[in-house]
Curated annotation (Swiss-Prot):
GO cellular component, one term: extracellular region
Superkingdom assignment: Eukaryota
Protein family (similarity comment): Belongs to the three-finger toxin family. Long-chain subfamily. Type II alpha-neurotoxin sub-subfamily.
Tissues expressed in: Expressed by the venom gland.
UniProt protein name: Toxin Lc b
Disulfide partners: 3-20, 13-41, 45-56, 57-62
Keyword match Secreted: yes
Record's keyword terms, sorted: Acetylcholine receptor inhibiting toxin, Disulfide bond, Ion channel impairing toxin, Neurotoxin, Postsynaptic neurotoxin, Secreted, Toxin
PROSITE patterns associated with the record: SNAKE_TOXIN
Organism (species): Laticauda colubrina
Organismal lineage: Eukaryota, Metazoa, Chordata, Craniata, Vertebrata
């Protein structure tokens, strides 16, 4: 699997990691910086705490930055 790890950077995921994810959350700075984002690979869709949104998908490069998609 190939997933984004940053807005424009991709990486081949480790064996067994077939899920790409994009987490987003408000870090309290409001509109100054917008939501914080975390990109990555995983074996299963990560469990997140309340207030954190996550998108999981299972095709190559399916977790792009929302503004670059």
């Amino acid at each position: 699997r190939i997933c984004y790890l940053a807005p424009r950077d991709t990486q081949i995921c480790a064996p067994g990691q077939e899920i790409c994810y994009l987490k987003s959350w408000d870090d309290g700075t409001g509109s100054i910086r917008g939501n914080r984002l975390e990109f990555g690979c995983a074996a299963t869709c990560p469990t997140v705490k309340r207030g954190i949104h996550i998108k999981c998908c299972s095709t190559d490069k399916c977790n792009p930055h929302p503004k670059l998609a």
